[in-house]
Each structure stands twice: as structure tokens, then as C-alpha cells.
Regions:
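Helix-rich cap/lid subdomain of alpha/beta-hydrolase
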Residues: 155-219
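Short beta-strand/loop motif that positions the catalytic acidic residue
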Residues: 251, 257-259
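Active-site loop/oxyanion-hole signature of alpha/beta-hydrolase fold enzymes
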Residues: 83-126
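Hydrophobic, aromatic-rich cap/lid helix
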Residues: 213-244
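Conserved HGGG/HGGXW glycine-rich cap/lid loop of the alpha/beta-hydrolase fold
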Residues: 37-91
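Conserved hydrolase catalytic core segment
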Residues: 117-163
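Catalytic active-site module of serine/aspartate enzymes centered on a nucleophile-bearing elbow/loop
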Residues: 279-318
Length: 318
């Protein structure tokens, strides 16, 4: 997800953590104190299975677009939260907060506040980075991870995005390249050209549902620009050299990689992450893009449900 008023979905776009609360997690909405501020959360469902906590993408694209995953709440609590600086979580005027380490501590604070002793993680786009980094220091009680449209190697991400840019009509591609060269990415022409890219590789469902529109409208620009950069194709922020591949071999919990057939997280790149992860599964969803749950909820949600059930069984869960 990238910068832009229309918003962007790039390294880029969410993570979900599912967990089991000490005294049970009841449906509720509230705010949680985290390092640097407060974050909004909503827990839905009251099923008996291990809860699911969702880590959205961006960085800075709030959790609205993950709404289809609420359908899993008939079996387990599902927890949505907007990371600090976007959506319903107020943005402090301090860009020094936008670091991987602080977001890991934020996730730890959310999990502690909600009493999630056992959890399944679901991360999408940037959320997969957050999930992976969280596992380095807080692996206890994490029972599985869904890596949705992962952005685990940012140099590869840029190469893949550039290859997709060259599939656009020349008239569209040249507008994008000219605006990025001149640093005029707020221009209406650039926004219109990028929307063509989004409709192909971010979300193919037309028209965009209200929740997806809200996610883009309420993007945290400071978070996105500081960590990512100006666009889907130019990563100049603090994530620019991120590569988490070396840690994938250390993962010992069940892992499912997902992506859309037309995802900006290219299926061949996602497959390389799956191959580097012991025992990992992978599923590609036909005719879907980066926001796979929005593009094909009828197929996607049952696939996530089935994976979580398998993970529960492996961990001796219900």
C-alpha cells in the first residue's frame, strides 16, 4: 500500500493474531495504552476456539478492509485493531515513533491488555513484517501464522512492483514515472494513474466496498511516508532495506502463505518465502489481488478457517 491521498496499499497492506484469553475474550470495543499513545480495538465473536488478532498492512492502512474475516467469529474471537497513527488510533506528532521495534512493542501491549495467552497471528502485507519481527522476541503462545500477501523482502518488492508497472498502458505508466521524477505525486493526474494500478493489483472488486474505501481514506500518511516512502514503486523510508528471509527457517509453528492471482505480492515471490519456511502451506486465490479477503471472501474466508482448525488440532486445541 503506498502513500497518496487515495491511499495506498503496499508493503505493504495487514496482520492477524489469534489468541486464547485467560478468562475468555468477550465482544467489546475500546482503546488500549501502547508505547507512544492509544490504539483502537474491537473484539467480535465469542466462540471457544483460540482467538484471532488481525495485523493490518500499510504501514498505516487501518483495519477496515479486513472486515470479511469477522465471519470467523462464529468459532473464535476475532480482534481488529488500528495500529498507532492511522484510522481510529490517533496519530501523535512524532515521526520517531514509526519504527519496527515500537510496533512490535505495541503488538505486545495489545496482546497483554486483552489477555491473549495463546494466539494465531494473521498478518497482511506490512503486517507480515510485524508478525515475523514479533516472533523473534515473543514466540510463546503463538499457535500459527497466516502470512497474507507478504512483504518480507523490500528490495524484491520494488523489483516486483516495477515489473507490474510495466504492464500498464504507456500513457498511464509515463504519467506515474514523470510525477515520481518531479516529486508531484499529489497531482490529480498521478492519483488517477495510480488508481488504474490499484484496480489491477490492489483490489479488483468493483466498485470498491465502503470498508476498503475507508481504509484508503484514513491511511496514516506520516507512518506510511516515514517507513515506506512516496509510492508503491519507490521505497525510501526506514523499511527500504528490510529482508526477513533469514528468519523464516526459524519458524516452528504452522504457517500459511496466501496471495491473489493478480497480487502485487507476486505469487512466485510468495512461493519463495513458503519454500524457505519449514512445513509451510501456500494458497493462491484466482482473480484476486492484494486485498484478497475483499476480492474473494467466499473462497478466502473458508480457507483461513480450515487452516486455523488444522493449527488448533496440531496444538491440541479445540
Amino acid at each position: 500500500m503506498r502513500r497518496m491521498r487515495i491511499a495506498a496499499v503496499g508493503v505493504v497492506l495487514a496482520l492477524v493474531v489469534v489468541g486464547c484469553a485467560k478468562r475468555g475474550l468477550s465482544p467489546r470495543t475500546g482503546m488500549i495504552d501502547v508505547p507512544g499513545g492509544k490504539v483502537w480495538y474491537q473484539a467480535v465473536g465469542s466462540g471457544s476456539k483460540t482467538p484471532l488478532l488481525l495485523l493490518h498492512g500499510g504501514p498505516g492502512v487501518p483495519s477496515y478492509y479486513l472486515k470479511p474475516l469477522a465471519a470467523l467469529a462464529d468459532e473464535r474471537p476475532v480482534v481488529f485493531f488500528d495500529q498507532l497513527g492511522c484510522g481510529r488510533s490517533p496519530a501523535p506528532a512524532d515521526s520517531s515513533l514509526w519504527t519496527i521495534d515500537r510496533f512490535v512493542r505495541e503488538l505486545a501491549a495489545v496482546r497483554t491488555a486483552l489477555g491473549l495467552e495463546k494466539v494465531h497471528l494473521y498478518g497482511t502485507s506490512w503486517g507480515t513484517i510485524l508478525a515475523l519481527e514479533y516472533m523473534k522476541t515473543h514466540p510463546s503462545g503463538v499457535e500459527s501464522i497466516v502470512m497474507a500477501s507478504p512483504a518480507l523482502d523490500l528490495h524484491q518488492w520494488v523489483r516486483d512492483a516495477d515489473s507490474l508497472r510495466h504492464t500498464l498502458p504507456d500513457s498511464t505508466r509515463l504519467v506515474i514515472e514523470d510525477a515520481e521524477r518531479k516529486h508531484t505525486t499529489d497531482s490529480p493526474a498521478y492519483q488517477a494513474a495510480m488508481m488504474e494500478y490499484y484496480r489491477l493489483y490492489i483490489a479488483r472488486r468493483q466498485p470498491w466496498p465502503a470498508d476498503l474505501d475507508s481504509a484508503f481514506t484514513q491511511i496514516g500518511q506520516s507512518v506510511y511516508t516515514t517507513m515506506d516512502g512516496p509510492s508503491e514503486f519507490t521505497i525510501t523510508g526506514t523499511l527500504r532495506d528490510y529482508d526477513g528471509r533469514d528468519f523464516l527457517k526459524e519458524l516452528s509453528v504452522p504457517v500459511l502463505y496466501t496471495c491473489g492471482e493478480f497480487d502485487e505480492a507476486l505469487p512466485r515471490t510468495v512461493a519463495s518465502f513458503a519454500e524457505a519456511t519449514p512445513g509451510a502451506e501456500m494458497q493462491i486465490f484466482a482473480n484476486a489481488a492484494h486485498c484478497t479477503a475483499e476480492d474473494d471472501s467466499a473462497t478466502y474466508v473458508p480457507a483461513i478457517r480450515a487452516f486455523l482448525r488444522r493449527a488448533d488440532a496440531k496444538q491440541g486445541g479445540r
